[in-house]
Amino acid sequence: MADDLFDFIETEGNFSQLLAAAAAAAEEEGIASGPDGGSQGSRRRGSSGEDLLFGPGGLFSDDAAEAEAAVLAAAAGATRPPRPPSAQQQRHARRGSGEIVVLDDEDEEEDEPGSPAAGSPGRALHQGSEHGHLVLGPRSRAGSGPRPPTPAALAAAEAGAPGGPGRSSPSAASPASSSSGSSGSSGSPGPSAAPRRWSPARGDPVGEPGPAARPRTPAPPAQPAAVAAAPARRGPASPASPAAGPVSAPGGGGAPSGGGDRGRHHHQHREPLLDEPAAARRLDPRPLGARSPVSSNPNSSSSSTTTVAVEPVARGPEKDEDGLGLAGDGGAPLQRQPRRRRAGEGALRRGRGFSSSSSGGSDSDLSPARSPSAPRAPAAAAAAARRSASSSSSSSSSSSSSSSSEGEEDEGVRPGAPLARAGPPPSPPAPAAAPRPSASSASATSSSAAASPAPAPEPARPPRRKRRSTNNHLSLMADGPPPTDGPLLTPLGEPWPGSDPPADGRVRYGGAGDSREGLWDEDDVRQAAARYRAAAGPVPVFIPEMGDSRKQHEALVRLIYSGAAGEAMSWLQNPRMQAPDQRFNQFCQRRVHAPHGHGSFITGSVTPPLPHIGDAMAAQDPLWALPHAVSAVAMSRRYDRTQKTFILQSLRRAYADMAYPGRAADPRAGEATVEALCARVRAAFAAAQPGRVPRELADACVLACRGVLERLLPCPLRLPAPARAPAALGPACLEEVTAALLALRDAIPGAGPAERQQAADSVALVARTVAPLVRYSVDGARAREAAWTYAAALFAPANVAGARLAEAAARPGPAEPAPGLPPLWPEQPGLVVPAPAPAAAGAPSGLPGSGPSSPASTKSGSSTKSSSGTKSGLSGSSGYASSPAAGPDPAPERRKKKRRAPGARRPGDGEEDEGLSGSALRGDGHGHRDDEEDRGPRRKRRSLGLGPAPDPAPALVSSSSSSSSSEDDRLRRPLGPMPEHPAPDGGFRRVPAGETHTPRPSAAALAAYCPPEVARALVDQEVFPELWRPALTFDPAALAHIAARRGAAGAPLRRRAAWMRQIADPEDVRVVVLYDPLPHEELCAEPAEGAPRPAWDPRRGGLSALLAAFAHRLCTPDSHAWAGNWTGRPDIGRLNAQGVLLLSARDLGFAGAVEYLCSRLGAARRRLIVLDTIEDWPADGPAVGDYHVYVRARLDPAAQCAVRWPECRELRAAVLDSSSIVGPACFARVEASFARLHPGAEPLRLCRQDNVRYTVSTRAGPRTPVPLPPRAYRERVLPTVDGCKDMARQRSALGLGDPDFDAGAAFGHRAANRWGLGAPLRPVFVSCGRRGLAELRGPEGLPAELRAFCAAALLEPDAEAAPLVLAPGALAAAGAPPAVRWDFAPFETSVRAAAGGAVETHRPSGARGPGEDGEDSAAVEIVGFRGGDGRPRGPLGPIKVEAISDDEEAEDAGNPYLLLR
């Protein structure tokens, strides 16, 4: 019968006729039940057939047997007792109250034998609810449409006459069942009423529990709850016509009806009271005015009685919003919504629909487990407990009956939404996961609840607003935020569906639970996985085959919280890819995305850098969803950049506690960010005021930079331009910068890649700006760290470690630093120098009374490091016997190569010398050995005995047998410890007091001392000019070197002392230029035949670059200015005549000479100008006091555009100029200082072509000084062709077919005859500034007008011309590009120059050659390659005669040299 009725309902949808038939049968039989369960003798008037459907024993009641009996009684008039419930009926009775439960195929089970539903085709209709809910099973297997009704069912339903197989009296129902009486509306639908279909209330879920409701314990199926039948209505109620009349119940009064326009489409609710039990807080699904108070017993410990009414609704043709297609006259019949079940979804799919669950009265609404902000873990635990308890059954119990309906789009009832009804005061709270009560206890509970009085009627509330229903159970949320602790679970506290690991050989792809085949064996994937493992940040393309996505997720989160606001979003949308990443991205598009549908196909990630969202769901980590949210916003086209930035900032703030969980309790939470600290550094430099910077303050800045770099490693560093000039920095600026760096060091942990890059850039900016203040060396700052002193002592050899540690402990503590700065030592300790002690036997030092602990025995502290990495010893120990004129050795056995003293090496200084007997002192002190020593030891040394003997060094002076022997020993060992009162004419370093421009020497260098008589004996030689000999006494290292070569002033020593002959009198020195030559570059040495030539270095300049700057010319590998092309020493006489002294770091007495000049001129109240071009400052270099003028510049061959951009032809003659590079701007500073210090002297001319002359090989001879003046050129060339009548030979000898200029110098006959052979073309200098030179990346960075000017300009040689410096913004003042004009030929305007193997023809602007009408005069035309004439043969023009003689009045008749053209 039930099957027939279901078929009838599905096919015809005439639910109202069924109700009418049931009402007619009820009128005949008088079916009604009282509160006590007995049958009513008389049926109340106005009740409808819904009592037979939803009342006790009705079709949709709890018991299937009673339901079927009631329907049969209504249709056929037969009466029979109900059958006991089957297992399936009991299972469906636990499905939850008042629900429409859509079952999947796997929910169906075999019914027990004898069950009415067993084997019945109508088992799709289950009566398994506590309070009469509708349970729909799977559709027919044959098709998706409903099954046709049977004729018997149709007839029985329409006529309402007897026709069923037996009738059962309603009085035979269980006596425990109860029904609350209700009074119907004014009219009940009869058989003639219009057909209506039953549907739940549109828009509002029925029976939804409140946010604080606890899981209810279902009542046993044998004790069905009372159901109040709602009267049927045809249409919506009007304000004048209420939806229903008052409803009465035993023990309670009628509730007033709440009218309104919405009528039956809304439910009336009120807010729950805190003193009401949870059993009474039920959603009343009845229409307005059709409710009755809930009958509950406040004395009962658990109550499960709930009133539920499902009303029939007449809807229009539109589809119901819940997507089930229930309403509407023309709508589709009731069907289950097809859906795919996921893993872990068992409890979720059973709680769908309209539910009104019950729970024990002991459940407290104030329990934190069900509070709006509490997690749902107790619900999940209760569900798991009930599933384990009912393992014999295939479906779990309704532990999730408290889940929200499908109409809720957020968790829980929204703020302002009506809540469940309130009841009596709450009972004591119960445990969160209480066991399910038995059937007997539930029955007793139901009975006691039914007999309890109902509360007072509730007032009417405004109708509840509609909400759009969804079909996704995951949208069931609760009020308030989700749990903030623990894993992120579903709203029901279960794992996310589809988060299980994919099957073997597959990876996540697509929707939840979907996967694809893995591609681990592809080469592209393996390479991408290797890059992913090695990457420090996020990779631009990620797929699951590359490895664990945790690293990528965390890197993306760091990226979002780093850098500017829009950088992360831009990178996520369009990640910057290198070539391998681009190839891998194409591979993924071809092999991963293309086989899986179109562009809108669900992939689980938005952009290539994002891993699949299933990894975040499986990890249950909400922080991993942040990159997906940011990427989704970035890909949206509905926001502009500012709006996206706002959303990103909102997400960053919302996720901040998860991304940085310890920041709230971190005391540094309020400190500035990395970006703000970097801006603070830049602002400090921008606001710098000039002032004298103490050296310890600069060292503190260096230490702060080192601290930041220590936190950043590894980090990509870029070399920026200095922010300010050294003279513009003041102490306040450095204090602010150092404090910002210290704060930046502490802010580095936790910073993202972009922030780390900003910090690295800031450190590089500070380093390049402060580097001139520390003389481009960190040794002084490192020596100020106290920890290094102790570390050097601890790591020293055992025989000196104790003494060094004691000395370190005895040193004074660090000085009080400035506020916010690290502590600094009062002086640079360098290597700890223990106190002098009596030397022991066998000590290798040659100093009297010195041992391993003597200051002079520490060669690292008393050596001078040159640019090539070699060092000169400070003491003349142990090497004097190797000298050819050393005389007899009192200890022959000491000629054997001695071992170095333990601990004599300075930590971190690299390879050391072997004393003065090593290569550094056997040669020129720079690693160049003497020629005579390269042949090995002398024969005389071999004849001496080599037997072992104790070292008599400590007693050489005191125990010598003769005075001559004692004198020789003193000359061989000139240095000793510094006495308390050194003699004024002794040999020692004289460092001025106060601040210095350059680093101060180490303590060991300052402790070396040579007695005056020994010093005079050593410097009294012809190789040293007399006026310069005092300069050597300022350098103990030079005295030690002279002592090692005493009596043998060979070529190396003479070469190193040749600088003394540049200017005869030190009083005439005005400017000292310090430079560091490249290997094999010599200023005062003749290049030997077969000697190694210097190697060209485009990144480092040496002597060649310096002289080219002074000579106002270019220096390229094929030019005369390059030292590799020299055949003799260059001539710098014009510079020396102006008082300019060039001093190399390799020269003998380099440090002493500078300090001597500073001391001598400073004592005369004269200031010395020091131009420093040394990049690698040598150890123990000269200390220049701040009294003198100090100018710092570097030599950079790449400043020449021909070297910087060799492919750019138009800028071959251009040179980039800046005050930080040796050139016109730097020379202008020196010249201005000179004019200020010497106003009456001749002004300096540091950038002129006659300052330097080179000796090179030309056609005039192998050693030709260039530029060779025109007269000297003719004197050398013309005699070779005198009397020669062979014109071809004359042409070849004079170079008539050669270009005018080659490699920028005059080469052809007519150019050499006019300007001199080798006269260079002048370059064009382009002023860029300090910052502009560093930021200039290519020739495109220069204005096009400037490039055109440089291409057309041709500056003819001029020995007295000043440099032409152009500013990119001041080209208008430069006028037309200069050009060469031949004054002897009216039509000869072009200049032929060779460069790069090609010959180019340059014509001045506006000039035209013969027959060149309309040709671009500024064009550069390549007419041929070198080797031939190369000139195009035009029409024969008039014969031109060139006067070779200087005599302008000479007659051409006697001149045999006529040039034909």
Swiss-Prot record:
One MF annotation (Gene Ontology) recorded for this entry: DNA binding
Name of this chain's protein: Major viral transcription factor ICP4 homolog
InterPro entries from the UniProt entry: Herpes_ICP4_C, Herpes_ICP4_N
Main location: host cell
Family to which this protein belongs: Belongs to the herpesviridae ICP4 family.
Biased composition (Basic residues): 894-903
Bias kind Low complexity: ranges: 75-90, 167-197, 224-249, 292-308, 353-405, 435-453, 838-888, 944-965
